[in-house]
Amino acid sequence: MPADPRNAGKDKGNLQMELQNLLTSARIRKMEYEAIVEELEEDELKYDLFEYQDYLENYIMPYVERAYKNGSKELIGMAEEVKSIFEEIIDMIKARIEKK
């Protein structure tokens, strides 16, 4: 079933739904990045490294903090998985830069 644009933004404020959406997005982002990382030039990799580190710190970590404040093991697990995926992407970029 395609997404209904009339429902856009309704998940805002619902931490579980926000984390589910973020987790799905992170998984897709990692798969997409794995497919192109070998083709990127060093300057592109360095830019991506900066962007992913910034995104992790300023966008993902607040979700992790909210999950821990909530105390739900399910939410903490989801938040930690999202964090882990972004850390894996960052590590992938660093490893590729070292090969250049």
Swiss-Prot record:
Record keywords: Coiled coil
Coiled coil: 14-47
Keyword Coiled coil listed: yes
Presence of the UniProt keyword Coiled coil in the record: yes
Protein's name in the database: Uncharacterized protein aq_1426
Species this protein is from: Aquifex aeolicus (strain VF5)
